[in-house]
C-alpha cells in the first residue's frame, strides 16, 4: 500500500499522510453483504462506559466478512478489492462458482481475477484456506482459528501474520508477531499469506478532527482532573501526582502489575510469553 503525504499548506496538513488507495478497485460495496451497525460509544448493555474515549464519528455500514472460510472445494474468483471502514485491512469480494458472494480479508499479493479455494486438499498459495495440520512448517498464515469451526480470531489486522514453526501431536506451534509462541489445534483453519495494507501503521492523521471522524474522543490526563475524578487530580497549579506510583482512574497501580488472569484456560497453550 502506498502512502500519500501532504505539503504543509495548513496546520492540519502538516505531517499528514493518508492511504493512496492504489489497491482499491471499486467504491461501491456489495449491497447484500451490508448490515446496519449502531455505534455503542463504549457503553455496555447497562449504559455504563466500559471503553473510554469512544463516541461520535461518521455512520458506517458493517461488511459481513467470511472468517470461517468453510465453503470447501468450491473455487472462487476475486471480483474486487475494497476499502472497509470498520477495520485496518482491505477486503476482497469473492464470486464463487455456485453463485454465492462473500467478503474475505484481502491478503498481500491478492489481485482481481485470482482464484482461491478452501479445503483440506487446497494448494499452498495466497488466500487459500486449509487446516493447520495440512500447511507446511515455515509458512506464514493469517485469520487463524482458536477453536475448530469458530472462525479466525488471530492475525486479522493490516500487516498481521503468524508463522508455523513446528508440530506436536495434534497441535501446531505458531509464532506471533509479538514473539509469543502458542499451541493451536491442527484441525483449526488458517489462510495462507499475510494481511495486506501493511503500511497502515505509517498513516499520520495530522489533526484531532480526523480521529473524531473515526469515533475516537480526547484522552484527558489524570493530573488535569479533579481529585474526585482521578487519583492524580487536584492540587494547586501543576502539582505532582502525590502517589508512590502512577494509578489508574480506579485507584489500582498502572505500572508493573500483570493483568492476565492466572487461571485462564489458554495459559496452558502458551509456550513462550510475548516479548513486546
Swiss-Prot record:
Residues 252-276 have a biased composition (Basic residues). GO terms for biological process: cytoplasmic translation. It comes from the Bacteria. InterPro entries: NA-bd_OB-fold, Rib_uL2_dom2, Ribosomal_uL2, Ribosomal_uL2_bac/org-type, Ribosomal_uL2_C, Ribosomal_uL2_CS, Ribosomal_uL2_dom3, Ribosomal_uL2_RNA-bd_dom. GO terms for cellular component: large ribosomal subunit. Keywords: Ribonucleoprotein, Ribosomal protein, RNA-binding, rRNA-binding. Residues 221-276 are annotated as: Disordered. One of its GO terms (molecular function) is transferase activity. Belongs to the universal ribosomal protein uL2 family. Part of the 50S ribosomal subunit. Forms a bridge to the 30S subunit in the 70S ribosome. NCBIfam families: rplB_bact. One of the primary rRNA binding proteins. Required for association of the 30S and 50S subunits to form the 70S ribosome, for tRNA binding and peptide bond formation. It has been suggested to have peptidyltransferase activity; this is somewhat controversial. Makes several contacts with the 16S rRNA in the 70S ribosome. This is Large ribosomal subunit protein uL2. It comes from Onion yellows phytoplasma (strain OY-M). The gene is rplB.
Amino acid at each position: 500500500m502506498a502512502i500519500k503525504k501532504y505539503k504543509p499548506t495548513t496546520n492540519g496538513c502538516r505531517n499528514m499522510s493518508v492511504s493512496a488507495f492504489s489497491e482499491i478497485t471499486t467504491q461501491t460495496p456489495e449491497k447484500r453483504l451490508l448490515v446496519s451497525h449502531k455505534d455503542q460509544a463504549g457503553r455496555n448493555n447497562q449504559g455504563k462506559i466500559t471503553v473510554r474515549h469512544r463516541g461520535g464519528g461518521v455512520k458506517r455500514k458493517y461488511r459481513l466478512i467470511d472468517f470461517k472460510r468453510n465453503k470447501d472445494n468450491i473455487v472462487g474468483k476475486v471480483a474486487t478489492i475494497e476499502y472497509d471502514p470498520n477495520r485496518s485491512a482491505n477486503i476482497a469480494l469473492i464470486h464463487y462458482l455456485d453463485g454465492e458472494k462473500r467478503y474475505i480479508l484481502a491478503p498481500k499479493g491478492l489481485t482481481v481475477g485470482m482464484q482461491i479455494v478452501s479445503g483440506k486438499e487446497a494448494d499452498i498459495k495466497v488466500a487459500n484456506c486449509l487446516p493447520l495440520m495440512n500447511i507446511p512448517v515455515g509458512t506464514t498464515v493469517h485469520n487463524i482459528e482458536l477453536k475448530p469451526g469458530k472462525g479466525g480470531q488471530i492475525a486479522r489486522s493490516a500487516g498481521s501474520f503468524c508463522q508455523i514453526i513446528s508440530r506436536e501431536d495434534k497441535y501446531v506451534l505458531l509464532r506471533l508477531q509479538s514473539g509469543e509462541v502458542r499451541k493451536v489445534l491442527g484441525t483449526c483453519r488458517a489462510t495462507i499469506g499475510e494481511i495486506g495494507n501493511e503500511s497502515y501503521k505509517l498513516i499520520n492523521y495530522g489533526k484531532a478532527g480526523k480521529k473524531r471522524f473515526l469515533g475516537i474522543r480526547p484522552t484527558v490526563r489524570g493530573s488535569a482532573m479533579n481529585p474526585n475524578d482521578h487519583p492524580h487530580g487536584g492540587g494547586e497549579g501543576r502539582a505532582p501526582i502525590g502517589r508512590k506510583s502512577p494509578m489508574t482512574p480506579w485507584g489500582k497501580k498502572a505500572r508493573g502489575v500483570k493483568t492476565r488472569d492466572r487461571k485462564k484456560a489458554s495459559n496452558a497453550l502458551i509456550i513462550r510469553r510475548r516479548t513486546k
